């Protein structure tokens, strides 16, 4: 008879969890950041708030964002005027949009990842889906499984309403699933649409206005598994370790609340300071076992919550400017897409590394770090090992 120990050993993979494919998607509606303040104040019937508009223009100018993608068009907003007010009951209208569009955008990203992976979708064993855009039952995971035609036996996990750090969380969970289930192939999808957070401006709540200047829509998907099939699957990055921690004395720094008016967003000014002050502790805990203490020897994927966070992290750690190039590139071209950002940055990095002939998927370097930051304040730290290109 087989012992429990033998049975458990047979269930586990031998090698580390590996990212085997990445796909991304955005809505077709592209918004130019330089003209967005005029559009935003016009569509929200707020053009009389001239001083506030000037403040918003300065926010957009400082955002380091050139363009964003948004499902919400002028037509949709004109049909739903309550979404354009600052605090008008509008959750039903918002929910009607996101329960359809979040899985749909996720499907586009997933199809690209599956195509790159090159294996039949029937080989997908697990699905991990996350979004901060709306809540529904059965969830987006169920809707996506139906849209893609995944097997009914696919083991699903749905994460709602976690915020910007969760791009790191889903990698941590997928790592555990891949390494503890021999032969598992995990489809991970992050899909975000700002229809839940869009609202008009308010003089008394400038933190809400910060969100209007930063957030964009996007979905990203990866396929993850251990022990890639040689000659069939192409590894991109290996996941070596993953950790989550709460930043001390940071309660209330970032809050979101689902209300009749949609998802409200609250931000303390000190978020960049709190993150930069505590980031080295996470790095030390992650890289001391590997004997690494030079943060410039790593390739970097950091959730781009906003330019101030990136600037302060760079300053605090003495990072060379090029370290956050891929991160800043994604912020510039897409804005803050919450959970999807770090996967967009991974995609940007591996493509640029190949195009520039840098030798590895991680800008020619062997080891890297992926950071997720969000409500809590919660920090996700993922240690990555690159693959030769």
UniProtKB/Swiss-Prot annotation:
Please give the function described in this protein's UniProt entry. Answer: The primary product of this enzyme is 4,2',4',6'-tetrahydroxychalcone (also termed naringenin-chalcone or chalcone) which can under specific conditions spontaneously isomerize into naringenin.
User: Which residues carry out catalysis?
Assistant: 164
Q: Does the keyword Translocase apply?
A: no
The Gene Ontology biological process terms listed for this entry are:
flavonoid biosynthetic process; polyketide biosynthetic process
Provide the protein name.
Answer: Chalcone synthase 1A
The family note in this entry says: Belongs to the thiolase-like superfamily. Chalcone/stilbene synthases family.
EC number(s) per UniProt? 2.3.1.74
Pathway given in the UniProt record: Secondary metabolite biosynthesis; flavonoid biosynthesis
To which species is this protein native? Solanum tuberosum (Potato)
Question: Which EC class heads this enzyme's classification?
Answer: transferase
The UniProt keyword set, sorted, is: Acyltransferase, Flavonoid biosynthesis, Transferase
GO MF: acyltransferase activity, transferring groups other than amino-acyl groups; naringenin-chalcone synthase activity
Give the superkingdom in one word. Eukaryota
Q: Name one Pfam family in it.
A: Chal_sti_synt_C
Q: Which gene encodes it?
A: CHS1A
Disulphide bonds in the chain:
none
Q: Name the Gene3D superfamilies on file.
A: 3.40.47.10
Q: Which reaction does it catalyse?
A: (E)-4-coumaroyl-CoA + 3 malonyl-CoA + 3 H(+) = 2',4,4',6'-tetrahydroxychalcone + 3 CO2 + 4 CoA
């Amino acid at each position: 008879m087989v012992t429990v120990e033998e049975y458990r050993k047979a269930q586990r993979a031998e090698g580390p969890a590996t990212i085997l494919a990445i796909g991304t998607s955005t809505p077709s509606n592209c918004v130019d950041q330089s003209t967005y303040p005029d559009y935003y104040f016009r569509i929200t019937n707020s053009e009389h708030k001239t001083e506030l508009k000037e403040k918003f223009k300065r926010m957009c100018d400082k955002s380091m964002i050139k363009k964003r993608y948004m499902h919400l068009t002028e037509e949709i907003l004109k049909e739903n005027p309550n979404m354009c007010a600052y605090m008008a009951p509008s959750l039903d209208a918002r929910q009607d949009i996101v329960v359809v569009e979040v899985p749909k955008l996720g499907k586009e990203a997933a199809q690209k990842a599956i195509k790159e992976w090159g294996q039949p979708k029937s080989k997908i064993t697990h699905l991990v889906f996350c979004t901060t855009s709306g809540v529904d039952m059965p969830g987006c995971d169920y809707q996506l499984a139906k849209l893609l035609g995944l097997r009914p036996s696919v083991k699903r996990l749905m994460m709602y309403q976690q915020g910007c750090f969760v791009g790191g969380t889903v990698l941590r969970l997928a790592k555990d699933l891949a390494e503890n289930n021999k032969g598992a192939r995990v489809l991970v999808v992050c899909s975000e649409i700002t229809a839940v957070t869009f609202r008009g401006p308010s003089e008394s709540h400038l933190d809400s206005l910060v969100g209007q200047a930063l957030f964009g829509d996007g979905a990203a998907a990866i396929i993850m598994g251990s022990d890639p099939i040689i000659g069939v699957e192409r590894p991109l990055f290996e996941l070596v370790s993953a950790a989550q921690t709460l930043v001390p004395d940071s309660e209330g720094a970032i809050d979101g609340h689902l209300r009749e008016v949609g998802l409200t967003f609250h931000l303390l000014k000190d978020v960049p300071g709190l993150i930069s002050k505590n980031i080295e502790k996470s790095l030390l805990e992650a890289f001391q076992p590997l004997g690494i203490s030079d943060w410039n020897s790593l390739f970097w994927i950091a959730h781009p919550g906003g330019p101030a966070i990136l600037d302060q992290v760079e300053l605090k750690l003495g990072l060379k400017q090029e370290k956050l190039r891929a991160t800043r590139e994604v912020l510039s071209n897409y804005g803050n897409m919450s959970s999807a950002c770090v996967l967009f940055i991974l995609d940007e990095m591996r493509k640029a590394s190949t195009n520039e002939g840098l030798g590895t998927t991680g800008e020619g370097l062997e080891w890297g770090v992926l950071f997720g930051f969000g409500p809590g304040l919660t920090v996700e730290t993922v240690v990555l090992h690159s693959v030769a290109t």
